Every structure is written in C-alpha cells, then in structure tokens.
C-alpha cells in the first residue's frame, strides 16, 4: 500500500517528533516502505545556529536510528530556506512530490488558539498534500 514515507523533522527533536518517528518506523516495517527524513533549515547567516556538518550529522544519526527501528532503508534531505517560518509548509509539500512519497508521517502539538487562525504545519500538509498524511499527536 505505502512504498515511500516522508518524515519531516524539527532538528530540535521535540517529543512530537520522537513519537512520530516510532509511527513512521512501524508503518515502514508493516508496509515494507522506505523512509526519507526531511528537515528545513535557514540559510541566513544571522540564523545559522548549526553548521551544515552538524545538521548532516544530526540527520544521519536520526536516519540510522530509524533504519534500525524499522528495518527499512532511510535517506535524508535538508532543505535550505530563506524564511523557514514562511516557507516550510510549501517546501515540505513540494519535497513530498519531488521524492515520490505516498505517505507523510508528521508529528504535531495539541491545537492552540493560533491554530484556528493559522494552520499548524501538519494541518497544512493534511489539507494541501496530494498524498496521505498521518498526523501524530
């Protein structure tokens, strides 16, 4: 049913990401799917809190953990953005199409008052992505 799972992550690894990682691993194991981890980071010099090498290492470590948990091949991709807050939703939706994902597994927080005005990232993907989206709370 699912062959390629896209797993968007916040590199600060809040609890929602860890829980969603468990779900992505279980679905990949059950479906025999591969996983691509996707992160969006800023390319503005004032916003660079981590080096490219540190980002690569963090994604590589997460990919190794996810591969061990799922038994599936796991790749990763970091997208550079001028304005992460404004562009992350579109970047994730485009990347899902580009890599041929047929499922997005994404963690989210409990709804806040602002989510009724501006959708969460998971809410945006659930509404706009052309593939299935599994939102993990």
Residue spans for each PLM region:
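Small/aliphatic-rich secondary-structure junction motif
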Residues: 2-50, 68-74
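Charged helix-capping and loop-helix junction motifs
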Residues: 20-22, 53-56, 89-92, 118-122
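Glycine-rich, Arg-bearing micro-motifs that act as flexible, cationic patches
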Residues: 103-128
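Short, flexible loop segments at boundaries between secondary-structure elements
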Residues: 131-137
């Amino acid at each position: 049913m699912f062959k390629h799972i896209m797993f968007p992550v916040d590199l600060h690894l809040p609890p929602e990401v860890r829980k969603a990682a468990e779900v992505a691993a279980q679905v990949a194991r059950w479906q025999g799917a591969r996983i691509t981890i996707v992160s969006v980071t800023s390319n503005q010099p004032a916003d660079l809190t981590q080096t490219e090498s540190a980002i690569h290492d963090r994604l590589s470590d997460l990919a190794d953990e996810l591969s061990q948990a799922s038994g599936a091949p796991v790749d990763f991709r970091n997208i550079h953005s001028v304005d992460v807050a404004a562009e992350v939703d579109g970047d994730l939706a485009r990347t899902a199409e580009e890599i041929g994902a047929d499922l997005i597994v994404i963690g989210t927080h409990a709804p806040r008052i602002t989510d009724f005005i501006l959708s969460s990232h998971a809410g945006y993907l659930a509404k706009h992505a052309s593939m299935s989206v599994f939102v993990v709370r």
